[in-house]
A protein has these predicted regions:
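Extracytoplasmic cell-surface/polysaccharide-interacting catalytic and binding patches
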Residues: 1-67, 72-79, 83, 87-91, ...
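Glycine-rich, flexible loop/turn motifs
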Residues: 8, 12-14, 29, 98, ...
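Amphipathic alpha-helical interface surfaces
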Residues: 46-49, 107, 123, 134, ...
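Surface-exposed patches in mature extracellular/periplasmic domains of secreted proteins
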Residues: 93-100, 153-158
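Structural recognition of the beta-strand scaffold that forms the well-ordered cores
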Residues: 97-99, 126-128, 168
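Short, surface-exposed glycine/acidic/tryptophan-bearing loops
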Residues: 102-125
Length: 185
C-alpha cells in the first residue's frame, strides 16, 4: 500500500484550511483524506463562496472595518455606505464555521450521509448557524452572491435538528440544480 501525505494546514483560501474542511469526530481506518479533485472542489467553494459569505456577513452584521480586494458580489453589501473608522458600532470579525466538508465513504456511512452526497467529492459544506435568524441571513447572502456573480450552486438546504441549525451548501463543477430546501425536524 502506498502511503500518501497531505499537508492539512494547506490554505484553500484566505480564511479556510484543508484541515477545517476535512475534520471529523469519526475514527476510521483510512482517515478522512480527500483526493486531488476533492481538494480542488473544496478550494472552489472556499474561494468563490465562503470568502464572499464571510465578507458579506461581516460587512452587514459584524465589524464594518472588514476589507477585501474587489467589489462585493453580494447585492446587500454593495448598497451599504462606506465604512467610517469612527463608527461606535464595531464588533469582532465573525468567522464562518464549517462543521462538515469533505467526507470519505467510511465517514459518510458512519454519520448517516446520503449515498451520493456532495460531501464525498468535496463539493459540499455544512455551515454552523446560531439560530433561525442567523441561518436565514446567511442563506440570503449566499443567494445574493449567486445572483450578483451569476454563479450557480447545487444545493442550499436550511437544516434544523432540535436546537441545532446549519446550512448544507453544495457547488458542483457543472450541472448545478439550484435546489433550495428547508429540512427542519
Amino acid at each position: 500500500m502506498i502511503e500518501v501525505s497531505i499537508n492539512m494546514q494547506t490554505k484553500l483560501s484566505e480564511h479556510f484550511t484543508l484541515a477545517e474542511l476535512c475534520k471529523t469526530s469519526y475514527i476510521t481506518s483510512g482517515g478522512n483524506i480527500p483526493s486531488r479533485v476533492a481538494i480542488e472542489n473544496l478550494k472552489r467553494i472556499c474561494e468563490n463562496w465562503l470568502e464572499d459569505l464571510r465578507y458579506g456577513y461581516n460587512t452587514l452584521y459584524g465589524q464594518r472595518g472588514v476589507t477585501r480586494e474587489g467589489q462585493s458580489p453580494c447585492n446587500s453589501v454593495a448598497e451599504l455606505p462606506a465604512h467610517r473608522g469612527d463608527s461606535p458600532c464595531v464588533s469582532p470579525d465573525i468567522p464562518i464555521v464549517i462543521t462538515s466538508g469533505f467526507r470519505s465513504e467510511e465517514v459518510n456511512r458512519m454519520c448517516g450521509g446520503a449515498k451520493g452526497s456532495n460531501h464525498l467529492t468535496g463539493c459540499a459544506v455544512d455551515i454552523r448557524c446560531y439560530g433561525p435568524e442567523h441561518m436565514i441571513r446567511m442563506a440570503g447572502i449566499l443567494l445574493d452572491i449567486a445572483d450578483g456573480t451569476k454563479r450557480d450552486f447545487d444545493e442550499l438546504i436550511l437544516e434544523q435538528r432540535g436546537t441545532t441549525y446549519w446550512i448544507h451548501f453544495a457547488v458542483r463543477p457543472k450541472d448545478n440544480r439550484r435546489k433550495i430546501l428547508f429540512d427542519c425536524r
